[in-house]
Design a protein with these regions (language model features):
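Catalytic core of membrane glycerolipid acyltransferases/transacylases, capturing the structured
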Residues: 41-63
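Divalent metal-coordination and catalytic microenvironments
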Residues: 35, 59, 95, 178, ...
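Histidine-centered active-site/metal-ligand motif
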Residues: 38, 98
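Divalent-metal-activated hydrolytic enzyme cores
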Residues: 1-31, 40, 64-79, 85-91, ...
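A common structural microfeature
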Residues: 30-33, 56
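Well-ordered alpha/beta subsegment
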Residues: 91-97
Length: 214
């Protein structure tokens, strides 16, 4: 903790030097993307994307779970998503999973004990679980999906149940990307919706959820 305090104070200058005074009305966040990922400490969105402070609006949850939309749910995840798309008007959403996810592995091996009632409820809710992968080929063949990838695609499906997402997609003002970061190699894969497979990430890779046709 002492190291954290020493690094946090004092700062020689604001971390984001935009050339705009902090008290000016225009000094407000204008992130380029909403980055949804796991709370795992090995995943560092700004390092992964090469972005500076102010360029990413981050949403981190245990197991990078995005619950299905419920109009009556008082959910911080839903509120953050709605704020990013409605108030901040981010043009891109990046849903990023990762390999060797401790939270997912713990759930698969043994659900959290009764001593962790909130975590147990979070992981055992049916709305959070990936369904069967209809496109998955025989285990071990090229193109087959891992349980982590199936989980990630389930969250993509959940994301598309939110009205704030569907509205923006329908008006072609939002792109949704699905990535998987490999903790061991540092490589990132992207979901190619047209080919229905994960491919090495590259600029030409189409968005996982393309805008709806006019």
């Amino acid at each position: 903790m002492r190291t954290f305090v020493s690094s946090a104070h004092p700062l020689p200058h604001p971390p984001a030097d935009t050339g705009v005074a902090a008290d000016e009305p225009s000094h407000r966040p204008a992130p380029r993307a909403l980055f949804i990922t796991c709370s795992d400490s090995r995943v560092v969105p700004t390092l992964l994307t090469g972005t500076a402070p102010g360029e990413l609006h981050e949403l981190r949850t245990t197991g990078h779970i995005v619950p299905r939309y419920r109009s009556d749910a008082h959910c911080g995840i839903a509120a953050t998503l709605e704020f990013a798309l409605g108030a901040l008007q981010v043009p891109d959403v990046i849903l990023c999973g990762h390999t060797d996810c401790t939270a997912l592995q713990s759930f698969e091996d043994k659900p959290p004990s009764s001593e962790l009632p909130l975590a147990r409820n979070w992981f055992t809710r049916p709305a959070h679980r990936p369904g069967p992968d209809r496109d998955q080929r025989a285990a071990g063949t090229p193109g087959s999906r891992t349980p982590e990838q199936r989980h990630l695609l389930a969250q993509l499906h959940h994301l598309r149940t939110y009205p704030c997402v569907t509205r923006r997609l329908a008006t072609r003002r939002l792109r949704v990307h699905t990535w998987q970061y490999d903790d061991r190699t540092g490589r990132t894969l992207g979901w190619d919706a047209a080919a229905r497979t994960f491919r090495p990430l590259r600029p030409a890779l189409p968005a996982a959820t393309a805008p709806a046709a006019r």
